[in-house]
Amino acid sequence: MKVQQYRLDELAHLVKGELIGEGSLQFSNLASLENAEVNHLTFVNGEKHLDQAKVSRAGAYIVTAALKEHLPEKDNFIIVDNPYLAFAILTHVFDKKISSTGIESTARIHPSAVISETAYIGHYVVIGENCVVGDNTVIQSHTKLDDNVEVGKDCFIDSYVTITGSSKLRDRVRIHSSTVIGGEGFGFAPYQGKWHRIAQLGSVLIGNDVRIGSNCSIDRGALDNTILEDGVIIDNLVQIAHNVHIGSNTAIAAKCGIAGSTKIGKNCILAGACGVAGHLSIADNVTLTGMSMVTKNISEAGTYSSGTGLFENNHWKKTIVRLRQLADVPLTQITKRLDHIQAQIESLESTFNLRK
C-alpha cells in the first residue's frame, strides 16, 4: 500500500507557521527526535531538547523562532509560537482514519433505530430500539447500544463498548474499548442488616469533544443524570459513580475514582490514582496531584496534595513509627510543649540580648 506523503509547505500552512527551507520536501510521518529519519517531521518543545535536535536525522523541525537560532546546522523549519500544539494538530493529518460507511451484515439493528447514511456500523454491533447514530460516526465491532441511546455526529466508539441507560452523547465523542457508559449505579438502602437495591432511574449525558479511555465505568444517575460537560478527557481505568457532574475541560488520569453525587468544576486536573469521596464540591481550576484523597469540599482554585511520595524503605519505616508516636500524643500536650519551648527561646534571647 502506498504511503501518503505531504509537502512541507502544506504542513506549514495547516499550522499557520512560517516555512523556512525547501517547501517541496515530502514527509510520510511524524517522529520523535531520537528516531526520526529524513522523511520524518519532528518538533522541539523547549531548550532541554536541543541537544537531541542537533543530532537528529529528521528532515524538518517544528520550532519557535528562538529555538531555531540554536540549530544553525539544520535547514528546514516550520516556525510557530507553540511547537507542541502544532505537533498535536499535525497528528490528525498523519492519523490512519476509518473511511468506511454503511452497516456490516452481521450487525443487528432494531427497525426503529435511526442510523445516518454516512455512519459506519461494524461487525456484530447490536443497536436497540429508538437509538440514534449521527453523521460520520464510527461504531466498531461487538459494541452494544441499548434502547433509547443517542450518539451524535463525528463520534468514534471502539470495540466492546456498552452504552446503556438511555445515555445521550453529543458530537465528536471518543470512547475506547471495553468501557461501559450508563451502567447501574451503586445504590443500596440498608435495612435490618441487609442491602436493598435502589433502581437507577437517571441517565448519562456527555457533551461535545469528550474523550473516554478504555475500561472505564460511568454509571447512570439514581434520579438525576450523571453529566460530563464539553471537552472532558478521561484516561483508562476510571470509575465515575452515579449523579457525578464534571465541568468542561476537566482532565482525569488513570485509576481515579469519583464517588456518587460529587460535582467537579471546570478546567480541573485529577492526576493518577486520586480518590474523591461522595457528595462533595470541587471548585473550578483545581489540580489534584497523584494519589490525593479528597474528603471535604474544595472551594478555591489551586493545587492540592495528600498522596505520600516515595521513601527508601528503612526511611519509610522510621517515618511511620514517628507518625504513630505523634498520633498517641494529645494535641493539647504538643501545643503546651511548643509554647514552653518558645518561652525558653524568648528568655534566652532576652538574657543574652540576641534580639535585633
Swiss-Prot record:
Q: Which CDD domains match?
A: LbH_LpxD
Q: Which residues catalyse the reaction?
A: H242
Could you say which EC number(s) this protein's record lists? 2.3.1.191
One Pfam match, by short name? Hexapep
A GO MF label: N-acyltransferase activity
Which InterPro entries did the record assign?
Answer: Hexapep, LpxD, Trimer_LpxA-like_sf, UDP_GlcNAc_AcTrfase_non-rep
Q: Which GO terms describe its biological process?
A: lipid A biosynthetic process
Q: Which NCBIfam families match?
A: lipid_A_lpxD (TIGR01853), PRK00892.1 (NF002060)
Stated name of the protein:
UDP-3-O-acylglucosamine N-acyltransferase
